[in-house]
Amino acid sequence: MTGNEQNPSKWLAAEKKYDSGVYNKHDVVMVRGQGATVWDENGRSYIDCVVGYGVATLGHSHPDVVKAVQEQAGKLMVMPQTVPNDKRAEFLQELVGVLPQGLDRVFLCNSGTEAMEAAKKFAITATGRSRFVSMKRGFSGRSLGALSFTWEPKYREPFGDAVDNKSVDFVTYGNLDELRAAVTEQTAAVIMEPVQGEGGVRPASAEFIQEARRITREKGALLILDEIQTGFCRTGKMFACEHFGVIPDGMTLAKAIAGGTPTAAFAMMSEVADRMPAGGHGTTFGGNPLSMAAGVASLRAMKREGLAEQAREKGAYMMDKLRAIQSPKIREVRGLGLMIGVELKEKSAPYIHAMEHDEGVLCLAATPLVVRFLPPAVISKEQIDQVVAAFERVLNNVNPREERQAELRAQQSEMGQQQVSQGESVQTE
């Protein structure tokens, strides 16, 4: 039983009452975080292997980011991008300094889906084309433009023809023949994640990404890599494309870019940027000085602390530990750096629930069968050991079939008691 079940929270009640209802809320209220640990309102600690869907790769409340935000909040928080700002210029210099060579122009925005919307528009103006190739099992965002690149039907179907699927061809991730057939002289861009996250934590092969680079050049299309979750040290490199020796024409960036503040970007080649007409795209809050200060601090901390190396070393350590678990329920452990998925032979939801409620470990799903771990790169090996031990206990102790059978027996017993009670009531009357 969690603390909130023992002591109902006014904050939980308020959030559930006033929220839009589109989120499936956990029965817990988090109030504080530091490094790889978060605490709920009752003081219970959790090892966080979700970190805001991969945002806090640098850890929660990194002192450099906190200091930068506090100082900037006392100076200037908002300034439109039509008016240059010192922190924005500083951030752009830092960002271009870590980007793959040639990606030296940046459109700043606030979220991953906004970055993908920008990528779509820049691809259209750069090529004069409006068809796209995206990946089955891929996830590119939920706003209407980005949603057209997202494969999962449950995200698209409620909005019908408002989602422009007719201009998008989906190919099987990793299938070279399908990719070659789909990319034509009408294709503006190929959109893909170097590691599919929502699609089950599936790293691409070097051959597939390299062929995507070759064929897009041949056909005059752009290659746009979605590095929203993989970027900024998550996979053991600053960007996942570095594992494959490929430089795209553009990259969508968000999540870990600025230490937890809502910041995103579309980074691109100059020839892509130069073909967008002035005023062809824009944003109100993108590039605001507060987020830019956080971004500068975050990027500098990543380099100084060797965050990519930490993710590479700790990711290999964690995957070795997970692969050592002797459980017939595990089909495969896969990933890159600290982007790790454990595919089970049955649905993952009961195990994810038990990890949170019984073990104090936060993790999440990636497809119904995969448990996804996205710990911060600052997680200690001792904490990794605790997470793996907790997962092994959960695999051993949780039996969804037995629990479901017990629920059914309880329901049948309750129905029987109600029938007996009704019979006694009739006799009494």
From Swiss-Prot:
Name the UniProt key words of this record, in alphabetical order: Amino-acid biosynthesis, Aminotransferase, Cytoplasm, Lysine biosynthesis, Pyridoxal phosphate, Transferase
Residues annotated as binding substrate:
142, 283
UniProt key word Transferase: yes
Cite the EC number.
2.6.1.118
**Note on how the cofactor is bound:** Binds 1 pyridoxal phosphate per subunit.
Q: Tell me the segments the record calls region Disordered.
A: 408-429
Query: What is this enzyme's class at the first EC digit?
Result: transferase
Predominant subcellular localization, coarse grouping? cytoplasm
Query: Could you tell me where the Low complexity compositional bias lies?
Result: 411-429
Q: Which cofactor does it need?
A: pyridoxal 5'-phosphate
Q: Does the keyword Transferase apply?
A: yes
Query: Reaction catalysed?
Result: [amino-group carrier protein]-C-terminal-gamma-(L-lysyl)-L-glutamate + 2-oxoglutarate = [amino-group carrier protein]-C-terminal-N-(1-carboxy-5-oxopentan-1-yl)-L-glutamine + L-glutamate
Q: What's the protein name?
A: [LysW]-aminoadipate semialdehyde transaminase
Lineage runs:
Bacteria, Thermotogati, Deinococcota, Deinococci, Deinococcales
